[in-house]
Design a protein with these regions (language model features):
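N-terminal amphipathic/basic-hydrophobic helices that include classical n-h-c signal peptides
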Residues: 1-25
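Flavin-dependent oxidoreductase catalytic cores
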Residues: 21-401
Length: 401
């Protein structure tokens, strides 16, 4: 069987640029690759997935999470842990874990030890939700952002997870310039705690309409000071945080996740290609572990542009000089093709890892994939979390509610 690889850069008719056998494509996805000095045996990455299972009220990782990550660890495989808040004020999602207390570090230590016992690797994703939050989650302080946008908290489509269920975000305020150094310091402290917790590296969450993204994109950043206006100014916070994180870990144990032209959480920019081209160029100077790129065909956990090719990874491939992790709506065949074509070095899967704990094995051996149940993505208990089995013929049904 021969498979055509299509060049999405071409205007007009799509151009077939190469022909690879099915076996050649699969072999590329399952060839070794190094991330810094970490030697991975395959290129199937577990994407960061918020699952709302940490212990309340202190956002502490628990034994349920240990089992979940143990099930999904693989020899030489990379797991990027779920979005993890850097401070109480950074919180924005009920029962999402943190990395700002000793109890949280102790909880994460159990998880990283379990992943390492299976000879896998794990990065912590560091997260500040910014305006995408509610005072009942932050514990009192109003959410902060690059600028104030009342349309955001008045939009009935914008919802955040709280003790009272899914509600509209609280009104937010603009971060004062004197406060920004404290935000950067919180990222650095969380990076230190990630090292104490046994992670192999850290990823900055700079996508999906959270705080760093709110500074990057001019639909949300209306500032007139040194952190607003030009692309260079809007990218300043991102680069300061990367500086802080690399000062703890070294450059080759830090990754950055971006979402070019992403619309989740009300995001927009007047020239996203220019913005993210600049970001990728600036990140080149660090020599990072990887750049993690979410395709714009995905909005949150929904594919909104079915059939659209991986355009973001494709155009940034020519700009970013390090490893690229592509994410967002990939199927097994398209994941294999994007690596074979060279537009990405690794592919991150989210929803398929929810329902297929042994996903790398299934992809390599071409085994059937289990369906996932969206109704149990954020249910605070074991249902739809640790009850999806590894592959067994005839045992591929969605777990019962």
């Amino acid at each position: 069987v021969r498979i055509d690889l299509v060049d999405f850069r071409s205007s007009g008719a799509l151009q077939v640029v190469s022909h690879l056998s099915f076996e050649e494509i699969v072999s590329k996805l399952f060839t070794p690759i190094s991330i810094g000095n970490l030697k991975l045996t395959h290129r199937v990455v577990m994407a960061p997935l918020t699952r709302s299972r940490a212990d309340l009220p202190d956002d502490v990782p628990n034994d349920l999470m240990v089992e979940y990550y143990t099930q999904r660890a693989s020899k030489g495989g990379l797991i990027i842990g779920e979005a993890t808040t850097i401070s109480p004020g950074a919180r924005g999602w009920l029962a999402a874990p943190g990395l700002y207390s000793d109890k949280q570090v102790a909880g994460w230590k159990k998880i990283t030890a379990a992943v390492h016992a299976k000879k896998g690797f794990m990065f912590a994703q560091l997260w500040h939700t910014g305006r995408a939050s509610h005072v009942s989650v932050t514990g009192g302080p109003e959410p902060v952002s690059a600028s104030v946008n009342p349309d955001y908290w008045n939009d009935p489509d914008k919802l955040t997870s709280t003790p009272s269920g899914w509600v509209q975000p609280s009104p937010h305020r603009e971060l004062q310039i004197a406060e920004i150094a404290g935000i950067v310091a919180d990222y650095r402290k969380a990076a230190v705690r990630a090292k104490q917790a046994g992670f192999d590296g850290v990823e900055l969450h700079a996508a999906n309409g959270y705080l760093i993204d709110q500074f990057l994109q001019n639909g949300s950043n209306k500032r007139t000071d040194e952190y607003g206006g030009s692309i260079e100014n809007r990218a300043k916070l991102l680069l300061e945080v990367v500086d802080a994180m690399t000062s703890v870990w070294g450059v080759d144990r830090v990754g950055v996740r971006i979402g070019p032209d992403g619309k989740w959480n009300g995001m927009s920019d007047s020239d996203p290609k220019a913005l993210f081209t600049y970001v990728a160029k600036q990140l080149n100077r660090f020599g990072l572990a990887y750049l993690h790129i979410i395709e714009p065909r995905v909005k949150g956990n929904v594919v909104v542009a079915e059939g659209q090719g991986p355009i973001a990874a494709e155009y940034l491939r020519a700009i970013f000089k390090g490893k690229i992790v592509a994410a967002g709506g990939f199927e097994p065949d398209t994941a294999e093709a994007v690596v074979a074509k060279g537009d990405a070095d690794l592919v991150a899967f989210g929803r398929y890892f929810v329902s297929n704990p042994d996903l790398p094995t299934r992809l390599e051996q071409r085994l059937p994939l289990s369906d996932y149940d969206r109704n149990t993505f954020y249910t605070f208990d074991a249902r739809g979390y640790i009850d999806y089995p590894a592959y067994m013929a005839g045992a591929l049904a969605v777990p019962s509610a």
